[in-house]
Amino acid sequence: MLETLFRQDAQRRLGDIGAADIIVGIPTYKNARTIAPVMRTVAEGLAREFRHLKSVLVVVDGGSPDDTVAVANQMQLPPPVKRLVMSYQGVQGKGSAVHAVFEMARVMRARAVVILEADLQSIAPDWSTRLARPILENAFQIAIPYYLRPLPDGAMTDLLAYPLTRLLYGADVRQPMGGEYALSADFAAKLAARDVWETDVARHGVDIWITTVALLENVKLCQVRLGVKLDDSRELSLSFDPTFVQAIGTLFRLVDIYKRRWLENVATRPAPFYGNGVAAEPPRAWMPAVTAAALGDAFVAGVRRYQRLWRIALTPSTRTAVK
């Protein structure tokens, strides 16, 4: 599978590094502004907390037209952390990059795989180590984040993913679409072998897919407190974009795939937490300026764009009331 994801020169560089204990993968696309501080912060944490382990920081790029790859290649990381910057082949999207990291972990016989986002502004040195520790200690097979986010950054999670996951599957996990997580090598290998990497899972559906598979296939899962998540939101988007369609489309496809599970009407159970941590309120300075007028304009634009679907989904009386 590795030969279909990377060119031969990239495969050679992977072979030169050899085996690893922990791989931290960072999918990138047009992240030239943010990749350096994220890499620096991650490497600092790995060098401090896991100095006795062989850690590899992998940047997996999706063909960025900016200087993302050049910036990542120029980064000097503290020993013993190794750096690997590669571009994958195939469907462009975060899921394809995650798939590539899973395949690299298999080849390098890693014990733990961590995935982080490339535009994190609030990342701390211990984020990757906090996520990896329950995996390295064989306590859990996947660790997902628990953090607070300023509005409306977490709208998809707060309004759809979290309530649906809790209601249908009886799983109280606050961030089922969190973009940061750690997995055991075995679980990562099983996910990599699934026949989903030509679907929206290869794009922005990957995060909710991984969490849902873990919850419904009896994979040992824990939550890890990371505090507050702030990312590099270049501009506030209140419209339906490909990210929304891919992520929520995957969410609803999973609802259909696992229909037998939610028809069982299981009781809600909280996912356990691992370790300590803080969950402070987001600083007011980081709260985006969302006005009632902007929300209203976005709603009207959505109504116009999806009138045909509204006619299918809503009764005439409901449509009249909305108008």
Predicted regions and their residues:
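Terminal low-complexity segments of carbohydrate-biosynthetic enzymes
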Residues: 248-323
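A conserved acidic beta->alpha catalytic loop
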Residues: 61-69, 120
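Conserved donor nucleotide-binding strand/loop of the catalytic core
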Residues: 55-58, 69-96, 104-107
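Conserved donor-nucleotide/metal-binding helix-loop-beta segment in metal-dependent transferases, i.e.
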Residues: 123-145
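Short beta-strand-to-loop acidic/aromatic patch adjacent to the donor-nucleotide binding site
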Residues: 109-121
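Short beta-strand-to-loop element that shapes/binds the nucleotide-sugar donor at the catalytic cleft/hinge
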Residues: 143-155
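Short beta-strand/loop segment that forms part of the nucleotide-sugar
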Residues: 26, 50-64
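N-proximal low-complexity "stem/linker" segments adjacent to membrane-targeting elements
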Residues: 1-44
